[in-house]
Amino acid sequence: MKKFLIALVKAYQRWISPLFPLSCRFCPTCSVYMIQAIEKHGLKGVLMGIARILRCHPLSETGDDPVPDYFSLKRKKTPLDN
């Protein structure tokens, strides 16, 4: 299941994402975050990725937002964000 979900995200990265201007406000990008979250947390990683996409808008903060080691739908604050 993980491989299938990751393949879907990679298909998006290859075929759909290039059609739009760069707009992700975080590092790693939302699609890379989704892949990392799925690899680390399985199906719960999909929920984490969706929550991340919902946080990625012009009014949100920017910066480093790595996948946490534990399941969470909130942004992981890093020392550089303070």
Curated annotation (Swiss-Prot):
UniProt superkingdom: Bacteria
Alphabetized UniProt keyword annotations: Cell membrane, Membrane
Similarity field: Belongs to the UPF0161 family.
InterPro entries documented for this protein: Membr_insert_effic_factor_YidD (IPR002696)
Identification of the protein by name: Putative membrane protein insertion efficiency factor
PANTHER family to which the protein is assigned, alphabetical: MEMBRANE PROTEIN INSERTION EFFICIENCY FACTOR-RELATED
Bilayer topology annotation: Peripheral membrane protein
Main subcellular location: membrane
